[in-house]
Amino acid sequence: MLGASGTIGQATLRALLHEGHEVICFMRKETSPAHAQIRHDLQDCTFRYGSVLDEDSISQEGFQGEHFDVVVSCMASRTGSPKDAWDIDFKAHSKVLALVKTMGVKQFILLSAICVQKPLLEFQYAKLAFEKLLIESGLIYSIVRPTAFFKSLSGQIERVKKGKAFLVFGNGVLTSCKPISDANLGTFIANCIQDESRHHKILPIGGPGPAITPMQQGQYLFTLLNKPPKFKHVPVGLLDVIILTLSALGKLIPSLRDKCELAKIGRYYATESMLVLNTKTQVYDPLLTPEFGQDSLFDFYKKMIFNREAIDLKYHAVFK
């Protein structure tokens, strides 16, 4: 397994172990408390360390000449910046795929993203480039494209608790999604091993409906916290100005190019729904978006607020 250190990776690893699979995780060697906690919590798994960008490391430190039936990858670039995306989402995966094809591995399960159905960003093109290689590889493949994650929609909880406004782009209903929990997604990914109906398929997947807009997310938080609703509407045009400015400055200052791409990513998520895109109408359609699991975003909000569950939002905590 690749990418076991992230929250989706951990959930998938737990699901694999729960189903009785013997799992070897190949990951970067880190000494952070988070990684130590993962190793402590998941002692039924074997951890091996090395670099996913080094073919020799993947072979000698990862596979070690052993036979494997399936590769499961929840690996993804951390920031979405162009270099990171092509290094991890494409190059690292490509190196692993080339190796496993020579080792008798029969099946490859890939965690991708639903947003690649309408590619406008470098990380989306990188993901699609590897998806194409995987589809053409001859292996049994399952490409899982989830909608939104719970923690991606939880970055404003502390802001609202402090009495600040909930930020929305435009009118707050430009987008909607059917978010899926880590645990439900992990189970869905793990089930792809045995479920032949998911073999040789691209699998968009969301959590239970109905689809939720940013305004509905904010309204629920205010109700939950017993606070009067207070929204601040951010014009999408502001993001356009930021992108144009960073794009122009990036020609002179290379370090700003990644920031420009990150601004483009922000605009994409502010204006594009994380639902299946109807290819005939070019409209995002919640009815076409498959659902899996029972966990709801609003129940997750309750746990975070009333049970004081600590979740590392990392890059998701954009609005503070």
What are these regions (language model features)?
Residues 152-159, 192-203, 226-229:
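Glycine/proline-rich active-site loop of Rossmann-fold NAD(P)-dependent oxidoreductases
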Residues 35, 39-102, 115-117:
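NAD(P)H-binding glycine-rich loop region in Rossmannoid oxidoreductase-like domains
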Residues 77-163:
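Glycine-/Pro-rich loop/turn segments that contact NAD(P) or position catalytic residues
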Residues 26-31, 51-52:
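N-terminal Rossmann-fold cofactor-binding loop
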Residues 176-183, 205-223, 233-244:
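Substrate-binding strand-loop-helix patch
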Residues 92, 172-193, 201, 213:
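Substrate-positioning beta->alpha
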Residues 237-320:
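A hydrophobic C-terminal alpha-helical subdomain
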Residues 1-21:
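N-terminal Rossmann NAD(P)H-binding glycine-rich loop of SDR-like oxidoreductase domains
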